Amino acid sequence: MNLIHKVSTICQCVLVILAKYCMQIIALSLMSGVQWLAWGIYKINKNRVGIIILFLYIMIVTCYVLTNLTPPGSPSETSFDPNSTRQYMTLQNGKSRFCEKCQEYKCDRSHHCSQCNKCILRMDHHCMWFKNCVGFRNHKFFFLECFYLNLYSICVLYSTFVAITKTFTAEGANISAIYLVFWGFLFAFAVGMSIVMTAFTFYHTSLLIHNLSTLESMSSSWSRYTHSTQPFNVGWYENWCQIMGKSPFLWLLPFPNSIGEGVEYPLNANALPYLPQTEEKNDKLYKSSVPASIAGAEGWSSDEEQYAMKNRRWNPHMGQYEWIEDFLV
């Protein structure tokens, strides 16, 4: 009975692990399977591309593991002090945003992740392939994963194409049909993966050089800004260095050298006129931007209209008034 109980317990543990880390197991299995096929091609057609593919595979697995195991960071894990830290994303009264679920204050660019059940520093998105949030502390590893996976797919595509064409053009070639089936599968997989990862890498490169997260790029609250007035856009080089680090020699290496601790970010000087103000400054801004005939409280036809006008701000980019709350996402 003891043996049966132990075996049953072990099986249950294995099933729990498989269920919990299903996507990670699938991802690593695909990487290893593709590399096994690619190495088989290298053994038959030896060239330098095969060595490059092996190096890229090592970098892919390394970055994948680091993205999974590195916590993205949370405001509670930093020296963030809502009373002394300069912030852009504040409430109308100038106070820091407060997360009701975490029961803690949120710093700039932090958002609550329902999957991780905590607030994430500079949250980009929650990725099912990593079972982790992509945030300030692991964003570099995530980007390098995309970058190296893109190069890997292109190199595998080239290597497979060369192997197939050599097989069909060489005289007296004697290659087993099973090899051609595997190579055909590998070629099709590499085509699809290279297309997807090229688009994905270009997209995330664009986000980095414009200092945007995926959440911010998809938010209607940020669509009102141009690149020149985006609050955190301080130039493509400085934007890039915030995540990838100051040293160009470490940009493509999986070392955690992002600048700062993800709490405070330099602001774009061009965006200063459009940044949220305190209640007092908002009131001054409002009075200077609405016609004098309706600026006084006695001019309001109803409490609702008074609230509506006092809680709107002129957006010069959109050419219309917008709710102040929309600026505070």
UniProtKB/Swiss-Prot annotation:
DHHC domain location: 97-147
Keyword Coiled coil: no
Keywords: Acyltransferase, Golgi apparatus, Lipoprotein, Membrane, Palmitate, Transferase, Transmembrane, Transmembrane helix, Vacuole
Domain of life, per lineage: Eukaryota
MF-aspect GO terms: protein-cysteine S-palmitoyltransferase activity
Membrane topology of this protein: Multi-pass membrane protein
Any one GO cellular component localisation term in the record: Golgi membrane
Keyword Iron among record annotations: no
Reactions catalysed according to its record: L-cysteinyl-[protein] + hexadecanoyl-CoA = S-hexadecanoyl-L-cysteinyl-[protein] + CoA
EC number: 2.3.1.225
Primary residence: membrane
Residues spanning the signal sequence: none
Coiled coil: none
Residues annotated as transmembrane: 14-34, 49-69, 141-161, 177-197, 243-263
Pfam families, per database record: DHHC
Post-translational modification as stated in the protein's UniProt record: Autopalmitoylated.
Recorded family membership: Belongs to the DHHC palmitoyltransferase family. PFA3 subfamily.
Function text: Palmitoyltransferase specific for VAC8. Palmitoylates VAC8 at one or more of its N-terminal cysteine residues, which is required for its proper membrane localization.
Domain notes: The DHHC domain is required for palmitoyltransferase activity.
Protein's UniProt name: Palmitoyltransferase pfa3
Organism field: Schizosaccharomyces pombe (strain 972 / ATCC 24843) (Fission yeast)
Gene name as annotated: pfa3
